Amino acid sequence: MASIAHLIFSGLLAATVANSQQYEGSSRNEDAFNYVQPRNTTIFGQYGHSPAVLPSPNSTGLGEWHAAYAKAREFVSLLTLEEKADMVTGQPGPCVGNIVAIPRLGFNGLCLQDGPMAIRVADYASVFSAGVTAASTWDRDILYERAFAMGQEFRAKGAHIALSPVAGPLGRSAYGGRNWEGFAADPYLTGIAMELSVQGYHDAGVQATPKHFIGNEQETQRNPTFDPNGTVTDVLQEALSSNIDDRTMHELYLWPFANAAHAKAASFMCSYQRLNGSYACQNSKVLNGLLKEELGFQGYVMSDWGGTHSGVASIEAGLDMNMPGGLGPYGTIPEAGSFFGGNVTQAVKNGTVDEARVDDMIVRIMTPYYWLGQDQDFPSVDPSSADLNTFSPRSTWLREFNLTGERSRDVRGDHAKLIRRHGAEATILLKNENNALPLKSPKALAIFGNDAGEPTMGAVNKANFEFGTLAAGGGSGTGRFTYVVSSLEAIKSRAKRANTLVQYWLNNTEVATTDVTTLWVPTPPDACLVFLKTWAEEGEDREHLSVDYDGNNVVFSVARKCNNTIVITHSSGINELPFADHPNVTAILAAHYPGQESGNSIVDVLYGDVNPSGRLPYTIARNGSDYNAPPTTEIATTGKEDWQAWFDEKLEIDYRYFDAHNISVLYEFGFGLSYTTFNLSDINAEPLVKSISSVPEQLPIQPGGNPALWENVYNVSVVVTNSGDVKGKAVPQLYVTFPDNTPAGTPPKQLRGFDKVPLKPGESRAVSFQLMRRDLSYWDVVSQQWLIPEGEFVIRVGFSSRDLREMIRITPVTDST
């Protein structure tokens, strides 16, 4: 690879990334959280630590893809070698990623677009709830319909491929800058969300791209540091290496991606950082071994933008598509060449790369294209995308793109109603003393906080901004708003109908330093609503876990004088909440990033039109210092490969860690209140198969891996009752405790089931949880397979990870042979 690189880059001067969209964060503030890598840290270099798995497996059309696979093979047989190189190499163009057309074969190319909460490079498109918001619903129907609706908009804008959904980051660190793009700090909940999201996109006719595969758990040093005085490939320091052991990889980080593969995901996006030394996009153990062999993945692997660091080595390791195709930071210097492109042609001609491997790369790309019928009547790319795409503006295009069809087409349909409902269903009621909520015909309301009002920095959240509601985070995972309903706007609209007096103060500095009794007139309000926000973005990890803009002191200032202070947070995820125990803080709502209907969603909950049923997809600790697994934010050495993140906590992230060490928390994983109350009773468990062995039957691999792992082996049922006075939705959760003889490090309990159950007052309903073999298995590093341990399991069902009300014991393994 080194000699090829010298051929490519000899004589090239350093190039700037003009006009591209940058996502690397600025330097951290002095008071920011900081974790300096110890000097004695073991350093994993790029080679020799992650085992080689070669050659890259050929696709076979498994998983009902046989007809599409045959079409793809026929298509490849008609290509010239140069066209084959084009099919695996991105080009700058109207979309975030582009594969050029081949008109003589009737192939119109491929359009790849961000992202996980909206089609970002588009106008007149909806901005949906963020991943963490969707996960907070704990609602399978919502997880599916959110992806389906987004898929409809992607397709209508001419995008074949949605760069979504996100399972990496999983949420190892509370400070992760992109945690909000993903779902939950738990592999099971994230896995369900991934599977349903993939199905939703595909049912809308759009290819899903689970990302970022794998171990992408922090933003700091996710990419190499390039030499500003060198060529476009000269690196001063390599990207951080996520060093993960085999069992942790399988039981935590691979788990939700297995769900995505099981759902027949079209493509996977490999991540930026290194993994056990080797860059993720040229790590053959991960791409060939885990994904294509163990999980039977039949689609293609694309690089994250600029995540390709070699040509031949990456191709052999299992990378099928280089995005966006160029060199340098984020691959946005196409005029400097490409690791793929013409070098693929050259490598085939000189025998360095077998042409059959290139053929399989394209078969993998084209099979889902045919499977989803994208060769038939697919909408053209909206020409406005070319004007909005700052990643590859027209001045950088090297090829012609025939952009036809309606410009700035409105693809939103009636999705606003769906987004509003999703935001309300995701809202988590953390505290509700004295039945402060729902609001009861208030005569006067006081609104405080810089999150309440209209956004003040345009339609796209490119950076943090002081004034205006926060409905999305920043980076490639954000969306372009056509409108945002602010909380203040929605409250004023609702209050007008009831002749309620609404007064508001949106300057946090003023509120935090003022006696608020001097602000409101003529008498104290019935309730004081404080709106707070927390920004997070791609490219940098969070500097703290507190709310932004001195929000804590805003709450304390208001609560000193108002005995009915209600706090609402629009946040990327975990916040320290030092005001939670204040006696005058009567209610707290966590709304995360709800998308364009933000204000309407929260008003529906505040006034009781919707009974809150959101539940936490992570743990809120009492103190930020209680969290483990910090991101590496600084190193004390200068070696080129010194940036390391050792996942020494192994399986102990989030609630698993707090449970294992018996640490008190403020609000536990799965927690959330309602305007009603629920009870559980009559737990029962029955096997679904006659005999269960520890070792699974070795069946032919299908997408998702060994089909035996996906077999339902036990059914657990419980009765849920609404014991309150209003209708509501219960969220029963099932947790499994493994036998004592399971290998050391097994968490005390693990989520393995959940449901969302609407109930009228006094109504009861039986709920069933079906446990698959994989749900009762651990990864055995010796035999390299999933095993159900012999002995007694404890099954608990409750309403959070620490509110477990029903328990039953089972002994699944009845066949020890």
Curated annotation (Swiss-Prot):
Pfam families: Fn3-like, Glyco_hydro_3, Glyco_hydro_3_C. GO terms for molecular function: beta-glucosidase activity. Keywords: Carbohydrate metabolism, Cellulose degradation, Glycoprotein, Glycosidase, Hydrolase, Polysaccharide degradation, Secreted, Signal. The active site is at residue 304. Residues 1-20 form the signal peptide. It catalyses: Hydrolysis of terminal, non-reducing beta-D-glucosyl residues with release of beta-D-glucose. Glycans are attached at residues 40, 58, 229, 276, 343, 350, 402, 507, 563, 584, 623, 662, 679, 715. Its EC number is 3.2.1.21. Its main location: secreted. Beta-glucosidases are one of a number of cellulolytic enzymes involved in the degradation of cellulosic biomass. Catalyzes the last step releasing glucose from the inhibitory cellobiose. Belongs to the glycosyl hydrolase 3 family. This is Probable beta-glucosidase G. It comes from Neosartorya fischeri (strain ATCC 1020 / DSM 3700 / CBS 544.65 / FGSC A1164 / JCM 1740 / NRRL 181 / WB 181) (Aspergillus fischerianus). The lineage of its organism: Eukaryota, Fungi, Dikarya, Ascomycota, Pezizomycotina.
